[in-house]
A protein has these predicted regions:
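N-terminal Rossmann-like NAD(P)+-binding domain of SDR-like oxidoreductases, especially those catalyzing
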Residues: 1-179, 301, 310, 314
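Amphipathic alpha-helical recognition patches that constitute DNA-binding helices
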Residues: 12, 16, 147, 184-188, ...
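Generic recognition of short, well-ordered alpha-helical segments
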Residues: 16, 41, 67, 88-91, ...
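C-terminal substrate-binding subdomain of Rossmann-fold SDR/epimerase-dehydratase oxidoreductases
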Residues: 23, 30-31, 190-191, 197-326
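Activation segment
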Residues: 63, 130-132, 183, 253, ...
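The catalytic Tyr-centered alpha-helix of NAD(P)H-dependent dehydrogenases
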Residues: 145-152, 182, 186-190, 218-221
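Hydrophobic alpha-helix immediately C-terminal to the catalytic Tyr-X-X-X-Lys motif of short-chain
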Residues: 151, 155-163, 192-196, 254, ...
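Transmembrane helix irregularities
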Residues: 180-183, 236
């Protein structure tokens, strides 16, 4: 039986990845910061909380990380832990950069020092590229990070490459573009729009307040993206790959689709310039051809289908704001 170690297991990607690996017969060890602060909703929702083992670990403590990896001796290590909100990174740039960089370096250094054949996956981000001159984004596209979050992810990306080339570690970067599901936190755009639109639908909110809708993003479906993560660590040698849908969709069209699905008039939409980001990228989408070819991975689902899936799940679990606070 293979053993997989997942940092960030309670998040959207970590939970879906844990479910996939449990179904494949892995022993899954999830790394959390603290049992007291962890939100176990996602693991409960997917029915796997009792099928994984949770271990506390401060990823910024190298000695702790080394000891845990020696104890667990994983075959595969997926690093999905990060402060992953672009917006929040502008409010907390120092803590975002410190945590996102130090955690990656400590995991890589621990693997080097433990000196066991551990395969390492690093969750990288399309935000690293910033404002690009040509689309689609490929691995040869120059990086120009425009946020503290993007800066931290770019550093982690190059750290993986450095350790791979310097110490012959099986370490891969999966450069993921936006990917959504019902388990996405409500602080992210798509889930925020669906959640608040649901409140309008049920008469618990008057308007949807959003920032700049005149931007386009490459959105995908989280359960399919975690499958690509797993496939990356099954290759004969490590690769850095772009995991994306290969096309962009405007934020405005997403809002309009959700409103139509829920029968909400567009007059309920309010543009709030206070919600604009300090620096915004107009359009971004990636080239997933290498991932499809190397991983034998297919992605052909329309993002509107994903929105419909999330709406159905959100509808079935909806609670009014008052009920949610209880």
């Amino acid at each position: 039986m293979k053993t997989a170690m997942i940092t960030g297991i309670t998040g959207q990607d970590g939970s879906y990845l844990a479910k996939l690996l449990v179904e494949k017969g892995y022993r899954v060890i999830g790394i959390i910061r603290s049992h007291h602060s962890s939100n176990l909703f996602n693991l409960n929702y997917l029915g796997i909380l009792d099928k994984v083992t949770l271990e506390e670990c401060d990823l910024c403590d190298l000695a702790f990380v080394i000891g845990l990896i020696e104890k667990i001796s994983p075959d595969e290590l997926y690093n999905l832990a990060a402060q992953s909100s672009v917006g929040l990174s502008f409010s907390h740039p120092t803590s975002t950069i410190q945590y996102n960089i130090t955690s990656v370096l400590n995991l890589l250094e621990a693997i080097r020092l433990v000196n066991k054949p551990i395969r390492f996956y690093q969750a990288s981000s399309s935000e690293m590229f910033g404002k690009v001159q040509t689309l689609p984004i490929t691995l040869s596209t120059p990086m120009s990070p425009l946020s503290p979050y993007a800066t931290s992810k770019a550093s982690g990306y190059w750290s993986v490459i450095n350790f791979r080339e310097s110490y012959d570690i099986f370490a891969s970067n999966g450069i993921l573009f936006n990917h959504e599901s019902f388990l996405r936190p409500k602080s992210f755009f798509v889930k925020k729009v669906i959640s608040e639109s649901m409140q309008i639908h049920f008469g618990h909110r008057d308007f949807l307040n959003v920032g700049n809708l005149d931007v386009k993003r490459d959105f995908g479906y989280a359960p399919l993206y975690v499958e690509a993560m797993w496939r990356m660590l099954q290759l004969d040698r490590p690769h850095d790959l772009i995991i994306c849908s290969g096309e962009s969709i405007s934020l405005r069209s997403i809002v309009i689709h959700i409103f139509k699905k829920l029968g909400i008039d567009e007059s309920k939409l309010r543009i709030d310039h206070e919600l604009y980001r300090p620096v915004e990228i107009a359009n971004i989408y990636g080239d997933n051809s290498s991932a499809k070819e190397l991983l034998d991975w297919s992605y052909d689902i329309d993002f509107r289908e994903i929105l419909d899936k999330i709406i159905v799940e959100e509808m079935s679990s909806y609670k009014s704001p008052d009920e949610a606070r209880k």
